[in-house]
Design a protein with these regions (language model features):
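Transmembrane helical cores of multi-pass ion-transport proteins
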Residues: 1-235
Length: 235
């Protein structure tokens, strides 16, 4: 239970930052992560697995959202899921052994670089305090695990610096500025775009990218967990 609570708390700042990259309300990524965690706990390839909104997928979805709107996310994700099911039926996981380790390393590092540059516009500011908080957050994340191992370092940084800005009365941009955080569960939203060839032309490049990136990340993570636990995952 403790592991589940700590994981949930660690995911909150992560998925909120990814929602900013994707150009959607933070509440959207939070609810999506809840659904993903529940689905993973039931249908996951191994016990005690969790998942949530991924920065790599946010990078793929972001350009489509900015160009065409949020309404195209749902059909794009549905199409990506269908593509991944087809990949699974075709035994795509078995082909992973033919990919050189250098390609895997380059893939992961490239995603990290893209996520970094996607955050730069939010970091670049004329307010020196924002730059200082950014640097202090990095230092806490790097050094906190050496002292406190029971609480995730990103959570420590967010709580500590949020309390600092709130108690000192600093007027800074907040997550609430990116979208509404009403605190209630949203209702089901039907498709807001027509299901026709025009929509398919818009979503299929994004859906294919989501499918490939999601598959690569999942298989890479599964391999890493297999190596750490010395047990096989159901790929």
């Amino acid at each position: 239970m403790l592991a589940g609570v700590l994981t949930a708390l660690a995911l909150i700042p992560e998925v909120i930052s990814f929602s900013v990259i994707a150009g959607v309300d933070p509440q959207v990524s939070l609810i999506a992560s809840v659904v993903l965690c529940l689905a993973m706990s039931i249908f996951g390839g191994r016990p005690a697995m969790v998942t949530a909104a991924a920065g790599s997928v946010a990078l793929v979805i972001g350009p489509m959202v900015h160009q065409h709107g949020v309404g195209y996310i749902l059909p794009a994700v549905i199409l990506a899921g269908i593509i991944q099911i087809l990949f699974g039926l075709c035994g795509m996981a078995r082909l992973m052994r033919f990919i050189p380790p250098a390609v895997m390393t380059g893939f992961v590092n490239a995603l990290g670089i893209l996520i970094f540059f996607a955050q730069v516009p939010h970091f670049w500011s004329r307010q020196p305090l924002i730059v200082g908080l950014f640097v202090l957050t990095l230092l806490i994340i790097l050094w906190a695990p050496r002292v406190i191992k029971a609480i995730p370092a990103p959570l420590i940084a967010i709580v500590a610096l949020t309390l600092y800005t709130a108690t000192t009365g600093q007027l800074l941009p907040t997550v609430g500025d990116e979208g509404s955080m009403s605190g209630g569960l949203p209702g089901f939203t039907a498709l807001t775009v027509p299901l026709n060839l025009t929509t398919l032309q818009i979503i299929w490049p994004c859906a294919l990218s989501i499918a490939f990136v999601g598959l690569m990340e999942s298989l890479l993570t599964a391999k890493l967990v297999d190596d750490l636990t010395h047990t096989p995952s159901n790929k």
